[in-house]
Amino acid sequence: GVSYFSPRFGFTCNMVENFEVVLANGDIVNANATSHRKLWKALRGGSNNFGIVTAITLRVFSQGKFWGGQTFHPISTRKDHFHALENLIAAVPYDKYAHFINTIVITNASYGNWFIGNSLQYTKSDPPTPFPETFKPFTDIPRVALFPGAPDNTLRVDNHTAFTLEYAALNVYPKRWQFATISFGNSAEMMEDFFQMANETIQPFLTLPGFLLSVAYQPLPTLMSERYGEVDSLGPIQTQGNMFYIHWAMSVDGSEVETDRKFEKVTRDLFQRAEAKAREKGLRRDFLQLTSNGTLKELWRVSKEYDPTGMFQKQVPGGFKLSEMDEDSMEL
């Protein structure tokens, strides 16, 4: 996935130099660039399909304290954010120290009202750069406290661990989550179109216990989508120009089991309508996170080689699975 450092170093999975993996037959292998290379490539983005990963060796780099945090804004400012995000994505050259996510959220706790929570990290350090010019279009947008007495931002200079713990604290109790993703060509107008369709879609669910929807608009400039030419299973290197992608996360309390199929249906319908709208505007794009249709056949073959009985397809629940796919009918 995308990290604070992806503009400089690429997707997180591509930082993995070695996977120690327990296979379905009990063998322990090391998958890397020179040994079990096909398995290494598959695990770089192929999810939980091939074995139990018991150790990971990551490429590392030096990183000091940096500036970042969250800012909170009224939903009425969303078009200002969308235009600023479009310009950020289109910047030439793209600022490799800039990590930004624009998230619009609606939840029971906000009484059914949308709000905006931005995540800004500027990873230049030694020394850090507070309020960099790159983020000025966002930091100039009026902010608001989410609740009386609460801060309207958490911006500061801190270390990576502190920023990670800040976001981890947002998920404090078990919930039922649905995740989805779609990408579009860089367009503030398409960002607004998606918001309007999402708002219409979720209205029937606002009173469900623990309901929350987070729609994150994430930049995907070409220097990230080209992935520095790394070997992985995220699909072909993209040549469709600057993009943004949506990370959709909808949840309710853990007891609301009956909502699963409803959520899946309405989300599929929404994404189909959004894709049709994007096609009309010439903004449809192929990129999908986690994996791509262009790599499914290769992943299927790796699964058959390393897990011929399909144990990790049939006995490990959850996540993206290959077990329902027929090699001969797959599109390439």
From Swiss-Prot:
Induction details: Expression is up-regulated during the late stage of P.nodorum wheat leaf infection and is controlled by the cluster specific transporter elcR.
GO molecular function, one term: flavin adenine dinucleotide binding
Cited function: FAD-dependent monooxygenase; part of the gene cluster that mediates the biosynthesis of elsinochrome C, a perelyenequinone phytotoxin structurally similar to cercosporin. The first step of elsinochrome C biosynthesis is performed by the polyketide synthase elcA which catalyzes the formation of nor-toralactone.
Keyword entries, A-Z: FAD, Flavoprotein, Oxidoreductase
InterPro entries documented for this protein: FAD-bd_PCMH-like_sf, FAD-bd_PCMH_sub2, FAD-linked_Oxidoreductase
Signal peptide: none
Pathway(s) where this gene product acts: Secondary metabolite biosynthesis
PANTHER family in the record: BINDING OXIDOREDUCTASE, PUTATIVE (AFU_ORTHOLOGUE AFUA_1G17690)-RELATED, FAD-BINDING PCMH-TYPE DOMAIN-CONTAINING PROTEIN-RELATED
Lipoprotein in keyword set: no
EC number: 1.-.-.-
Family matches, as Gene3D superfamilies: 3.30.465.10
Family from the record: Belongs to the oxygen-dependent FAD-linked oxidoreductase family.
Name the record gives this protein: FAD-dependent monooxygenase elcE
